[in-house]
Amino acid sequence: LLKELDELYAYSNANKVFCVIGYPIEHSLSPVMHNAVFKALKIDAIYFSVKVDVSMLKNAVDMLRNAVNGFNVTIPHKVTIIEYIDELDASAVKVGAVNTVSNSNGRLKGYNTDYHGFIQPIKSRGINLRGKSVLLLGAGGAARAVVAALCDEGIARLIIANRSINSNVKSLINTAMDKGIECKAIILNESNRYSYDCDLIVNATPLGMVDVFNRDKGSNSSNSSNS
């Protein structure tokens, strides 16, 4: 990470620096989108991606605290990152995951924009999810935001498909059941059996990411987890 930061500062004279961290990170279009916006709005800033595996997350956060103005968080760090930042916005508390971190003089505050990023496009199309059945693939940080939004929208039935019925799945099931939603947990490869009975299917896994998922082998080339 230090090498990447040194190379970045040598290359750029930008006044503000932002990044996205994750593992894998090759799929992320965040640098393309953010840098395009910075250029269009004449903002003196640069945005880049940094590959950070789980074992390096704490060290990476410590370095970024003194190096960037803010950063985004993608798989598989959206939940674990909470341990290493100073404060949570109400959005992050509600979801239990963080995908955006602001840096105010070294104090890091976490936010969650996945909730609105998921539900707003659905609402903008006039789709009403109340009373509907939903199949959710995955049980990681993104899935937490999806479940929070689905609960608020009043769905009737939720099926969560994951590689294993782990503690993350059970936590999401409990969250939904507390809202009176009928729930079921299944293994990911059983999804086809249930998909036809659902009104909405949500993919909150790395499946489909460019250069990340090997369709022939049915596993992630990076061995990242959907947990």
Outline where the language-model segments fall.
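Short, conserved loop/helix-junction motifs that constitute active-site signature segments
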Residues: 11-12, 129-130, 152-154, 216-221, ...
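Glycine-rich adenosine-cofactor-binding loop
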Residues: 22, 110-115, 122, 127, ...
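Phosphate/diphosphate ligand-binding glycine-rich loop within oxidoreductases
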Residues: 4, 8-125
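C-terminal helix-to-coil terminal segments
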Residues: 1-6, 224-225
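NAD(P)-binding Rossmann-fold cofactor-contacting core
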Residues: 155-179
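Residues at the starts of beta-strands that form the adenosine-phosphate
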Residues: 17, 133, 156-158, 182
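Receiver (REC) domain switch-region micro-motif
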Residues: 71, 134, 201-202
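Rossmann-like adenosine-cofactor binding region
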Residues: 181-227
